[in-house]
Amino acid sequence: MEGTSRALSYGFEVGDMVWGKVKSHPWWPGHIFNEAFASSSVRRTRREGHVLVAFFGDSSYGWFDPAELIPFDANFEEKSQQTNSRTFIRAVEEATDEASRRSALSLACKCRSKFNIQPANEAGYFAVDVPDYEPGGVYSVNQIIKARDGFKPGEALAFVKQLAAGPHGCDQNGLEFIKNRARVSAFRKAVFEEFDETYAQAFGVHSSRPLNDTSKVSKQLAKEPTRGIGLFVFP
């Protein structure tokens, strides 16, 4: 599609988190939405050469020329402080939560449960259950690969050491801190062993290794991503 091609020419991909400006509103956090997941009524409003952006906080959306968008991460510090309105703060909180989940996505796999990652209804997309986040988040193969490439063991270890040496010396509201914290937490859950064999042997505890509970399967393989769109439209 022409809109997607233009997005690529500006360094964006479908799924990328961005800031978009609408008339008198402040720059608002959102993400470039795959048109395949949109309703027919939304697709009918499509504008040539534009991409569909779903915004956080108020379920609004709009068609944007990629030239009108700016990257989410690089502009977070400035744009997240624009106003104290409750609606805007809620949108930033939702966007920050999504950025955290995408960071934790790097450690999602079928190691513990084969149901963690399931094919979505759109080719090339998967519904992923990331621990501590809303289940059934839908991501493309490229997004999952990008998330995994973003996990650097050495950097994660350096982050933990930095926290241990000076827990109050970090900007805990900064986006990088939030994303690093999500990765470390996800790693902790990925390697956590409920059954400690060494402990059991040392203290003579006769407990059995728990079996994976396959009954806790996410029944919500959404037809569209959890961040839905469609209540309001910006021209």
Question: Can you say where each PLM-predicted feature lies in the sequence?
Answer:
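Short beta-strand-centered aromatic/proline hotspots
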Residues: 27-35
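Structured beta-rich ligand-binding regulatory domains in large eukaryotic signaling proteins
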Residues: 40-42
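Extended, charge-rich intrinsically disordered regulatory tails
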Residues: 178-235
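Acidic, Ser/Thr/Pro-rich intrinsically disordered low-complexity regulatory segments
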Residues: 1-4, 218
